[in-house]
């Protein structure tokens, strides 16, 4: 089953390689979508893919790269669009 989710990650998640870590996790799991820094210091991610792959991807987001400190992850389910063709850093 294909699912789509939006994540907003808070904590020490900018200037620690979080977007590149997220891009690598998406490639590893075959997840499509994008990641971007938000002006308020959080990171936003939209992910679409197989439900099990998105769950594994989410576990990676909750852990983060070595220098990050993930304090909060807000998750919203979305309707999969099928429009994503890869995973990009915005």
Where do the model's predicted regions map?
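Intrinsically disordered, low-complexity, mixed-charge
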Residues: 1-90
